Amino acid sequence: MIAIIDYNAGNLKSVEKALHFLGEDCVITRNFHEIETADKVILPGVGAFGDAMEQLKKYELDKVIHQVTAENKPFLGICL
């Protein structure tokens, strides 16, 4: 399963639609457990890094991102 991180910004639905087109199982989530247990993680972009970081910190998603990248889990950040 691929976790698409939901931080109230980004092109979530476009990424989800593309993954479904490719036959991939995915979930849009900000749930730590779903992100930690996913096989792969995608962080959709907004084109404004400062705004993205503000939202990630608001939901404390920066912590789970550090965790999954430290574990060398496949991680894709888009347009940040």
Predicted regions: what is each one?
Residues 1-76, 80:
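N-terminal beta1-alpha1 cap of cysteine-dependent amidohydrolase-like domains
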